[in-house]
Amino acid sequence: VRQCAFRVLVYHNRFAVEFFHALTDGTGALIFVKTLLAEYLSQKYGLTVPAVDGVLGRLEEPSDEELEDSFLRYAGDVKASRKESTAWHLSGTPEKDGFKNLVTLMVPAPELKACAKRYGVSVTELLCAAMMQAIAQLQAEKVPQRRLRKPVKVLLPVNLRNLFPSKTLRNFASYITPEVDPRMGDYTFDEICAAVHHRMGLENN
């Protein structure tokens, strides 16, 4: 972290940026990516991309709002325990030299939204439920004895800018952890969707 808190990866006509989460969150990272792409298009092709819709002006001084630590500004005095039950952890076979595989799935957005609507959940909740179902099925294969299984959880980031009037580009996200306990029995996909949806509604306010 002290050497470099983020890095830009380029491969053919694709690039990605990896951030240490203390630096920023998904919102700040997306703004950086848009601004970086705008600058690339400017230098490579001479295109002028206006500094709007999440694109910052490279030569402009950052505002105090962009640099603000919104956690310090909006944090209250209420303290809550962060202790949770232990979740089941995925395991795999490490690749040689720390190599990591990237699996990409492309889904038409209209179809994804329509599917989420059928289950009465948001797209985020639908994808979370799908991951939880896959993890539960994998755990059932690896841990045949139900009583030895552990809760299935997915950590979902929540953009706190939707709850507080903040324009910070620093990390301003919280997390919600929907879960199902396979020791209580098998869950249908509808039941998992409902569990995720109600957990999100309970905590995301």
Predicted regions, residues:
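Non-catalytic, low-complexity flexible loops and terminal extensions
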Residues: 11, 23, 27-31, 35-114
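Alpha-helix boundary/interfacial micro-motifs
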Residues: 29-30, 37-38, 43-45, 52, ...
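Acyl-thioester-dependent acyl-group transfer interface
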Residues: 1-6, 104, 113, 137-205
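A generic secondary-structure signal for well-formed alpha-helical elements
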Residues: 36-47, 131-142, 200, 204
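Acyl activation and transfer enzymes in specialized metabolism, enriched
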Residues: 17-34, 102-147
